[in-house]
Amino acid sequence: MAPRKTVGILGGGQLGRMLTHPAALLGIPLLILDSGSFTPAKQTLLPPPSHSHPDGPFTSEPHIRKLASACDILTVEIEHVNADVLEAVEKEGLCEVQPSPKTIRLIQNKYDQKKYLAEKGVAVAPFEELPANPTEEDFKAIAGRLGLPLMLKAKTLAYDGRGNSPLKSTSSEDIQASLKFLGDRPLYAEGWAPFVKEVAVMVVRNKEGEVQSYDAVETIHRESILRVCLAPLRGERGVNQRARELAEKAVGHLEGAGIFGVEMFLMPDGELLLNEIAPRPHNSGHHTIEACLTSQFENHLRAILSLPLGSTALRVPSAAMVNILGASSTMDAIDKMADNALTVPGAAVHLYGKAESRKARKMGHITVTAESDAELNERLRTLLFAQPDAHADWIDLIAPPSPAPAHSHPKPLVGIIMGSDSDLPVMHPATKILEKFGVPYELTITSAHRTPERMVKYAKTAAGRGLRAIIAGAGGAAHLPGMVASETSLPVIGVPVKASVLDGVDSLYSIVQMPRGIPCATVGINNSTNAALLAIRILGTSVPALNKATEEYSKALEEEVLAKVDILEEEGWDKYIERLKK
């Protein structure tokens, strides 16, 4: 294998630190430019032989040029760099720069970025530039066009909410408060986006312009700082794919190679609006280290070095990332959160090696993976309640508590539906089987004939909400199981319900006689027990613990029958029959 090219990184923070891990595994020499000899990134990887990690500001022209002279490729872990120097370095042939300095410069100015994307047909919220030294009349005029409230944004040097200020009215007090918060920076205004979720997609782009996206994630912020990511994005059917397509479209219009973090808003009507792009690894992609076949950090290096891009697929059905934020100047809270995470199955701790803690500073993160959303939910609650600023109400919104008995689980794997409440006595045994196996489920009523729109919506959103199987009970015409099967990709198990006439045979025939291409499993009349057991066997193909539990259940049935055989032989059948009559 030919020696790898040497990569220089501008910035030695936590993103650079996490780039060093795959670099070491792939034998990629790295040189890291930042002030100090013990930055997070410099702690974890030695420089190539006869070199040392340069010590100096990553915005300094002399230091950038010195780094460029020792490297084959320069890249960034932060976009607030000197794009002019990077452009000059590349033009002079000192070294290659990825992503393109042109792209970095564009992204540095959020107004220019938004204007460019809008011109390329990428969906964004309405926005307008504010003049230099805007007057109150300027604010009133723009509010008249964009409406109130609106978001005032700094064009440059804005991250973690530090460049955003909501303007709720055009009163002098509100205007001056926003101007004071944003400081003496050029501004633009953006129409208010009353989103239902904030979404992010990581996209990797190689030098040939090929783009691949990771599954979209839901990003949950508190006080404008990212706190939790949930992967994959759950919601209406197709929303994950639409988010990926929007992100790929946006990154496809940029120049250069590397990983890009694309943030967007999911609106109440299902529309997706792009918010902004980061030309580097992103906090919303940290889960990819444990949760995906190739991490965002490895794929960034692969892309800029023209190595084959790695698969972006998830390794696990469910994953989350929790940021570890400083609570004070001491490390006590950080250590407590990390130690607590070590007790949580599927959790991996990443501490960034920062020497000083301060309130709201990103000191590390925890990735947690699970076989299901419900399992992830419980693990996530343990992690969130260990945070020093834990608030039960906020945590319950992100990771709802387990339900009371005989109530639907907030993160179900199996859906139980029926056409009428009169079917409940028949479907009730299925709930007991699922509870016995510890399978989270939901139960509701939806009729193929009386509530067809509700039925269609349920079927179309089931997979996107994390369900993996549906048990549908119906009597008479019994169209519910088949109709649901025609609207979802999930396995549907029909339970024929015995009605007042025909003893349920009509229901059985209706469910079992589905046309080719629309499979619908069918169990015996009124036998929701077998429907639940079949659903568990389906889940067991991907959840080993359920497969083992099914084997134990079958073994218990065998032992029960063998015990009866022994009693029958010991007592004789006459006494056995008499005991059965009792």
UniProtKB/Swiss-Prot annotation:
EC number: 4.1.1.21
Annotated protein name in UniProt: Phosphoribosylaminoimidazole carboxylase
Keyword ATP-binding: yes
SUPFAM superfamilies, alphabetized: Glutathione synthetase ATP-binding domain-like, N5-CAIR mutase (phosphoribosylaminoimidazole carboxylase, PurE), PreATP-grasp domain, Rudiment single hybrid motif
Keyword entries, A-Z: ATP-binding, Decarboxylase, Lyase, Nucleotide-binding, Purine biosynthesis
Pathway given in the UniProt record: Purine metabolism; IMP biosynthesis via de novo pathway; 5-amino-1-(5-phospho-D-ribosyl)imidazole-4-carboxylate from 5-amino-1-(5-phospho-D-ribosyl)imidazole (carboxylase route): step 1/1
InterPro entries per UniProt: Ade2_fungi/plant, ATP-grasp, ATP-grasp_carboxylate-amine, ATP_grasp_subdomain_1, PreATP-grasp_dom_sf, PurE_ClassI, PurE_dom, PurK
Gene3D superfamilies hit by this protein: 3.40.50.1970, 3.40.50.20, ATP-grasp fold, A domain (3.30.1490.20), ATP-grasp fold, B domain (3.30.470.20)
Any Gene Ontology biological process: 'de novo' IMP biosynthetic process
Domain ATP-grasp: 114-305
The UniProt record lists the keyword Lyase: yes
Alphabetized GO MF terms: ATP binding; metal ion binding; phosphoribosylaminoimidazole carboxylase activity
